[in-house]
């Protein structure tokens, strides 16, 4: 999708940003073992449950003076045949350590990238996902196009795909599990667990894909609150120190795509970005994501027109209840349609919430940390044609949206669609 105000140089900008557009959704995973158990059926197709559990757990560690840890781990789900994921659930562990998990994302590693992924995994130890992880080496660009399989945040619960739909999982694929650990909530060992319910490709489901829709927040310190980091330029330097220089490149690129001057974007307690649909399809599911200052998030189809339609409206956002919803009836989108994501924040919460009030006041913009912010709508999409066949060597599916997919990106977060910024 594309911002309606994107500059004509958007295509070149996206290529420039490719190495960093995967940075935002921190990651954490664990050594995992897989087991499969035949379960129920979906439209007569047998359901296989894949359980991927940590064997040792992971103890998060913040670096560079930060309070967050993004860690990636490679998991082998032991997929023996082309399959569709019909439901998934991430379990952030048990006990007090549950509060440390800010979010988790599962990325598909198709068979053609398995060898490179195993190299990146450093013999099962995983890797830190801030900036451009050197462990990924020259292969980082390939990871940017990896589809999302599932995304979790507090309160998200189980992802159950709408009937007749499923997320492609090719035979021989691996999974990268990212987990973002928030050390403001603690630093105990965490033992996540993932469960996937799959059916064979013969079920002929309509393939789903997840499209992130980001906008950059620029939230000044509240009236009467002062400090050195209340200056945006000072805070950008702090972000670069904590997460790497990619973060300022990412912010500037996304500002440009959303029609703003990256050197002096408008600041305030709201932000928006409008993206353009490039192919026909249906939106079947949606979810919000902001951090602790978030108050409201919405996604609107063709905002400002006689045909405007609300895709998602969360007027009372709660970080601890970031649930996704299945949309009924499905919302049809066509080339040229727009999707506008809008977010509202309350910066005074930084002086009220226990996790944030211990920190110095600061200007808040897009960043990987829990004390930073995001504006990210997620939509699950399927092709318009129910008989669309899956390319199992390169499964993407769904509609295409011009511009970059936002959201957390560890050193160039995977999930970028094959689209241009010029719609």
Locations of the language-model features?
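Bacterial N-terminal signal peptides that target proteins for export
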Residues: 2-20
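Residue-identity detector for glycine
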Residues: 9-10, 26, 411-412
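C-terminal motif of bacterial Sec signal peptides marking the signal peptidase cleavage site
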Residues: 29-32
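Bacterial signal peptide processing site
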Residues: 34-36
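Beta-strand-centric surfaces of beta-sandwich/beta-rich domains
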Residues: 38-282, 287-423
């Amino acid at each position: 999708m594309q911002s309606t105000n994107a500059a004509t140089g958007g295509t070149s900008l996206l290529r420039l940003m490719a190495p960093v557009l995967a940075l935002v959704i921190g990651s954490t995973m664990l050594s995992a073992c897989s087991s499969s158990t035949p379960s129920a059926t979906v439209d007569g197709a047998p359901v296989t449950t894949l359980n991927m559990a940590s064997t040792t757990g992971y103890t998060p560690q913040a670096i560079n003076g930060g309070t967050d840890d993004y860690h990636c781990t490679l998991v082998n789900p032991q997929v023996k045949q082309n399959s569709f994921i019909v439901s998934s659930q991430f379990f952030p562990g048990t006990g007090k350590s549950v509060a440390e998990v800010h979010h988790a994302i599962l990325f598909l590693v198709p068979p053609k990238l398995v060898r490179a992924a195993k190299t990146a995994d450093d013999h099962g130890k995983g890797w830190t996902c801030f900036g451009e992880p050197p462990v990924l080496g020259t292969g980082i660009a390939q990871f940017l196009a990896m589809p999302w399989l599932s995304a979790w945040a507090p309160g998200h619960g189980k992802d159950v795909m709408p009937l007749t739909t499923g997320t492609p999982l090719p035979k021989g694929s691996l999974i990268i599990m990212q987990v973002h650990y928030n050390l403001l909530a603690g630093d105990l060992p965490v033992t996540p667990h993932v469960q996937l319910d799959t059916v064979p490709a013969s079920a002929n489901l309509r393939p789903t894909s997840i499209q992130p829709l980001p906008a950059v927040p620029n939230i000044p310190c509240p009236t009467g609150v002062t400090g050195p980091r209340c200056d945006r330029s000072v805070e950008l330097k702090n972000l670069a120190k904590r997460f790497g220089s990619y973060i300022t490149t990412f912010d500037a690129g996304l500002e440009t795509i959303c029609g703003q001057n990256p050197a002096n974007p408008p600041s305030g307690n709201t932000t928006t970005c409008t993206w353009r649909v490039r192919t026909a399809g249906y939106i079947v599911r949606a979810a919000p994501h902001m951090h602790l200052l978030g108050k409201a998030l919405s996604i609107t189809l063709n905002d400002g027109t006689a045909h405007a339609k609300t895709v998602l409206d969360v007027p009372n956002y709660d970080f601890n209840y970031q649930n996704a919803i299945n949309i009924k009836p499905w919302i049809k989108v066509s080339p040229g349609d727009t999707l506008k994501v809008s977010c509202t924040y309350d910066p005074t919460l930084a002086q009220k919430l226990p996790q944030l009030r211990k920190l110095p006041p600061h200007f808040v913009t897009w960043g990987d940390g829990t004390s930073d912010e995001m504006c990210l709508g997620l939509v699950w999409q399927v092709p318009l044609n129910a008989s669309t066949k899956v390319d199992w060597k390169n499964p993407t599916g769904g509609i295409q949206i011009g511009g970059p997919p936002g959201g957390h990106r560890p050193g160039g977060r995977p999930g970028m669609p094959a689209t241009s910024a010029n719609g």
